[in-house]
């Protein structure tokens, strides 16, 4: 027997409800009554009031109309001050929206019509059809009353409609004055209510960022500028530069000079840099500016305008010239207690491996000794002492002389040059150590001494120009290895300096029909480095003619790739400026034409994150290979160069490269590890580490070599234990293959670079600024790695020393106003992006407290853990001057 359904049971009730909802009542009045019964007394009262107001608004008596409109306005205003859900008045007025619109259209021009337009503008917020922009139209016809009284949501909606209307009017070329008056009001409202980001967005949409300058004040200019600088990364040119210009002006307006200087450096605008110096009157602050310029690797001459007093000017110029770098670096090394020299064996840790590899050939092979030379140079870089080259000559075993002669011909060049690396940044001592090798009759030794002079002077400027004085005499030597030593030395010592004396000496070599190809290639590369990012026409012409003069056979040589690279470096990061040269490159011999095109494109857009260029380069990678084409290598490296500027693009690029690996042809697979190495340089991301580890066992030895070198690059200067372990295992895996073992050793040298105190990352100042010289050094090495066998495993292994351009201490060293190091507690943790967030959120997470000097890993940020001092730099990296806080009270 079927159970009798209980009319009060839940199920039955639910069914009944369903039935009532499904069948619409014929009598709509009953339905309305039912709805009204659901309302609370207050809501019912409000609904009835609003309906009454709607009727009164249509009353012929203007007095009644006015009272009704004012009452309606009050109800709506009270409810829209905060919008968590659609306010009740807007709900209840929904059915009457059409009626009010019709009545508004019929009304004669009067203040009452404007009042009604204001109310309709707010109602349109929830009621107008998509894309009609009714809210804005009624606002423009309404009164001039305060826009903010209707609440944030209304203002935000209006801003969105203005942006669309602006675009349409620009297309029609009609007047936008009425819109701009409204924009003024909205921006003013946003800036007063901590919504700086929305104000900036609106002004970007209506292309009038200059308005910001009127509306920023002391409380919100920092947040505004932070947003401007981070938004600039995602804007197409030339908008990005305009946005940064505004940020610069705001910083100058509020005397926030260190931040202004950073933007001036980013824009590469020398006038702005000078303006920062002339606007600021505080000498100690100027010292901090000098440290910032020195870290950027910029050649900069101070003049009377910037610093009036000669003595002060000299002291400041010393800082710009980086003459304090070695001292600071060694202070850090002593503090962390890593001064003791390390031998290559300390790095290889062969005792940790099982017997096979460690009991390998015990005879000294030239290649093993060469790799030990490099490992020794990179690991002890800048420490001024090691156990192979700087040992006093009286100790018999392993003295410098002995070690030098364990290397064969061109190996001696790298061995002597390694002295420059060990004495890095300490010019006087370094030149003293190298001096004796100039008197040698052995050309490779002299070449090494010349290169060593260049390395020791890297990034250090000196009034008496010792590098030029020593090297210029050897530029036209008969022996090509000596010439290359001098030319490379000049390129490294004067990178980024745009030194005309050197141009006068090196340019003739490019067009000398009798000069050997390798000398011409290195001359082009050195000129590219000295004039990096300068777009210098003369140098570009010289390199273009040199490329046109090459014979078919020479264009097939491995070193020829340095000519297009030298040309590309002239336009590093300069975007459209490269176009004329790129057109000329289309006339080159087809053997080098595409290679040149890819190199120019990737250099010009390096660090810009330009999505369209990434797509162009990916398209090149997708083409099928025609025999003899070598242009896809630089295209893959170009992908990394363009996309490395910000985190989002970088992660996207890593994923794209995974696809390129899967579907690309063999020559592309050889370049992918190098691109990954550049994207994560000195920043060992686990996913990339695993990919490279997989590729390091690839059946194609070129892919394996590139992956091994890249493992070294992503771990460069980090002492990363996991990468060190991988490389140790690879050294036992490849113990029979001299070439691959050489690559493993080089990578081990990179990982332990400067005993873990250095970084190769070309970005600094919290990834805002890109040092062009540093990137030039890294890219040169990567292009050389595209043909490992001919260049790095051939006789041009000293190309590895170009990396010195990117080597910088990853330290934060605090000094007092007289530039003496002081130790203060600082918190070091993962940096958090707080741009556009409300309030004052924490800028670091997961921090530890240390005493300065401290090391900063990739993605880390430091902040002072004491209020006793105020830092003069907004970004705590490198040398930071602290001044005592006058308001500080000891507890």
From Swiss-Prot:
Family under the similarity heading: Belongs to the proteasome subunit S2 family.
Any one Pfam family match given in the protein's UniProt record, by short name: PC_rep
Region (Disordered): 1-43
UniProt protein name: 26S proteasome non-ATPase regulatory subunit 2 homolog B
Residue ranges, compositional bias (Basic and acidic residues): 14-37
PC repeat copies, ranges: 414-447, 448-484, 485-519, 522-556, 565-594, 674-705, 724-739
Function: Acts as a regulatory subunit of the 26 proteasome which is involved in the ATP-dependent degradation of ubiquitinated proteins.
Transmembrane spans: none
Taxon lineage: Eukaryota, Viridiplantae, Streptophyta, Embryophyta, Tracheophyta
Keywords attached to this entry: Proteasome, Repeat, Ubl conjugation
GO terms, molecular function: enzyme regulator activity
Tissue distribution: Expressed in stems, leaves, buds, flowers, siliques and developing seeds.
Quaternary structure, from the entry: Component of the 19S regulatory particle (RP/PA700) base subcomplex of the 26S proteasome. The 26S proteasome is composed of a core protease (CP), known as the 20S proteasome, capped at one or both ends by the 19S regulatory particle (RP/PA700). The RP/PA700 complex is composed of at least 17 different subunits in two subcomplexes, the base and the lid, which form the portions proximal and distal to the 20S proteolytic core, respectively.
InterPro entries named among the record's database cross-references: 26S_Psome_Rpn1, ARM-like, ARM-type_fold, Proteasome/cyclosome_rpt, RPN1_C, RPN1_N
A GO cellular component entry from the record: proteasome complex
Summary of the knockout phenotype: Normal phenotype.
SUPFAM superfamilies: ARM repeat
Post-translational modification: Ubiquitinated.
Gene Ontology annotations of biological process type: protein catabolic process; regulation of protein catabolic process
Organism the protein comes from: Arabidopsis thaliana
Superkingdom as given in the UniProt entry: Eukaryota
